[in-house]
């Protein structure tokens, strides 16, 4: 069953993956260490972001599934739990703080997921533009836009936006 997913991840150069709602071999996929860490990250070499489906359940050691079992998801390297209405006040009542205090989750496991999230963000075009690094496509599109602006200014015609607003760019 996994071959199609492996092809999509490797050949499609996936940068983010959402785990499904369902259990597989007794473990909900959002918290399935073998699936997310051993296979996806280990065997396939995936380094991107993994997020749960909205209000996905997780379980620990084959127990009952619950949206509160977020520590098991973090341990499996499911980096982002979707969705929490008020994370500052733990409105979902997840078990992260308790699991950390009891030693069922380590600071290193939390840091590993934080590193996965940061690695993902550092590779986004928005981040690259924010630090002044653009791709060849960004540079090409910017040059084309500049050329279009110059041609419009030389023609003496106003630039018309999608909403119909006309802008006189001859003085630009």
Q: What is each PLM-predicted segment?
A:
Residues 42, 62-172:
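Preference for extracellular/luminal or secreted protein segments
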Residues 2-13, 36-43, 119:
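Structured alpha-helical segments in the cores of large, soluble enzyme domains
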Residues 19, 48-52, 80-83:
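Hydrophobic faces of well-ordered beta-strands that scaffold small-molecule active sites
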Residues 23-26, 55-58, 86-89:
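Solvent-exposed loop/turn segments at secondary-structure junctions
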Residues 4-28:
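Short acidic, glycine-rich surface-loop motifs adjacent to enzyme active sites
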Residues 26-34, 64:
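Short glycine/threonine-rich loop-to-helix capping motif typified by GTGT followed
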Residues 1, 17, 53, 77, ...:
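Conserved, mostly hydrophobic/aromatic
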Residues 13-15, 44-48, 78:
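Short, well-ordered coil/turn segments that N-cap beta-strands
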């Amino acid at each position: 069953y996994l071959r199609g997913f492996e092809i999509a991840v490797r050949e499609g150069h996936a940068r983010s993956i959402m785990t499904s709602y369902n259990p597989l071999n007794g473990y909900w996929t959002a918290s399935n260490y073998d699936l997310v860490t051993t296979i996806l990250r280990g065997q396939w070499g995936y380094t991107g972001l993994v997020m749960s489906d909205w209000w996905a359940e997780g379980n620990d050691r084959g127990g009952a599934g619950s949206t509160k079992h977020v520590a098991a998801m973090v341990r499996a390297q499911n980096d982002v739990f979707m969705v929490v209405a008020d994370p500052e006040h733990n409105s979902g009542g997840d078990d992260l703080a308790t699991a950390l205090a009891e030693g069922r989750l380590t600071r290193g496991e939390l840091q590993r997921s934080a590193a996965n999230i940061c690695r993902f963000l550092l590779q986004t075009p928005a981040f690259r533009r924010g630090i002044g690094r653009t791709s060849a496509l960004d540079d090409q599109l910017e040059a084309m836009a500049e050329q279009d602006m110059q041609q419009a200014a030389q023609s003496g015609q106003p630039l018309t936006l999608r909403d119909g607003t006309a802008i006189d760019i001859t003085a630009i």
